[in-house]
């Protein structure tokens, strides 16, 4: 079964109905693929929606993700260490949240779906880049 890790930007594209990411989310909802997101990226998603649309909308969208087919992954010891290693390797290029997504994709042997151009240049995992 296909596995994806979704970064914050891709989740935001999904929120606005971007057709480029729709097929990936359809695969998950139909049970043909699995998708994961880190708690850290979910926090980033919440605050970006809160900044633009307010806390009430952020709460609704946050709970929709929690109740969707996306697996929300907590930062356990293995993921935290791997994200730290990635941040050390890509210091100055990738945010800590991006390093968590990258580490999760590596641990899950998943394709990382991202809108981040710097993250798209990394070759640690398979990446599908959606320019914005």
Can you annotate each of these PLM segments?
Residues 6-7, 37-38, 94-95, 116, ...:
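Histidine- and aromatic-rich ligand-binding microenvironments
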Residues 34, 71, 126-128:
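Conserved beta-strand segments of alpha/beta enzyme cores
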Residues 10-11, 41-42, 79, 101, ...:
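Alpha-helix capping/helix-boundary segments
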Residues 71-113:
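Active-site neighborhoods of divalent-metal-dependent phosphate/nucleic-acid chemistry enzymes
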Residues 1-37, 50-63:
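Short, well-structured N-terminal submotif of metal-dependent ribonuclease cores
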Residues 43-46, 84:
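Amphipathic alpha-helical segments within well-ordered protein domains
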Residues 29, 66, 106:
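Anion (oxyanion) recognition and catalysis
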Residues 1, 102-132:
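Acidic, PIN/NYN-like endoribonuclease modules and their adjacent C-terminal/linker elements
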């Amino acid at each position: 079964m296909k596995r994806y890790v979704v970064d914050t930007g891709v989740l935001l594209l999904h929120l606005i109905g971007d057709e480029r990411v729709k097929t990936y989310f359809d695969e998950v909802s139909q049970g043909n693929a699995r998708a994961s997101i880190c708690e850290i990226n979910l926090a980033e998603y919440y605050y970006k929606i809160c900044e633009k649309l307010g806390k009430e909308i952020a709460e609704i969208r946050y709970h929709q993700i929690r109740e969707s087919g996306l697996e929300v992954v907590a930062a356990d010891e293995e993921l935290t260490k791997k994200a730290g290693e990635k941040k050390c390797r890509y210091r100055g290029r990738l945010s800590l949240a991006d390093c968590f997504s990258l580490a999760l994709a590596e641990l899950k042997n998943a394709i990382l779906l991202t809108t981040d151009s710097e993250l798209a240049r990394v070759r640690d995992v398979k990446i599908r880049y959606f320019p914005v």
